[in-house]
């Protein structure tokens, strides 16, 4: 059994422009084993997700829709999404006639607090959760699945926000 290691972009590097030679390898206690740079403050949260879900990859974004909706639904049990065809792109969902709930945890500067807050929801979360006022974490069996889950959840969050804006204007 190999000890857990993550391949990740170091802190301070533009994640949209990161090159393979800039990536670092981090162990289960956030020590950099290979590469130049420092592990980000959020490394321990990524580790917590991998340990709980057996994910092969974890991705994180800071979209407008995810950030705004996470604040709006904070304390309301998450963001309900149902009836959208795109739900079928999430692992385990076979029909659009499905309802999911994206969990939201309150933001904290303590990654330990964030990890403890999301831990009870990780097994049942639909491949992702939101940190209120911050952004979306999504995961999957590998990088491709994680990217698919991230893109689908971001799409559904944008749909939800647009739906709310239309309802408000009507």
Predicted segments, located by residue:
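Glycine-rich flexible loops
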Residues: 1-170
């Amino acid at each position: 059994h190999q000890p857990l290691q993550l391949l990740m972009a170091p802190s301070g590097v533009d994640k949209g422009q990161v090159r393979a030679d800039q990536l670092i390898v981090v162990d289960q206690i956030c020590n950099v084993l290979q590469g130049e740079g420092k592990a980000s403050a959020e490394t321990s949260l990524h580790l917590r997700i991998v340990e709980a879900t057996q994910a092969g990859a974890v991705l994180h974004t800071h979209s407008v829709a995810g950030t705004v909706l996470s604040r709006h639904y904070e304390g309301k049990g998450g963001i309900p999404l149902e009836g959208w065809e795109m739900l079928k792109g999430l692992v385990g969902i076979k029909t659009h006639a499905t309802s999911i709930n994206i969990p939201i945890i309150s933001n904290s500067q303590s990654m330990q607090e964030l990890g403890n807050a999301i831990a009870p929801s990780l097994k049942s979360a639909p491949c992702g959760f939101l940190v209120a006022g911050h952004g979306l974490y999504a995961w999957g069996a590998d990088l491709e699945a994680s990217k698919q889950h991230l893109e689908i959840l971001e799409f559904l969050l944008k749909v939800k926000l647009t739906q709310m804006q239309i309802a408000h204007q009507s």
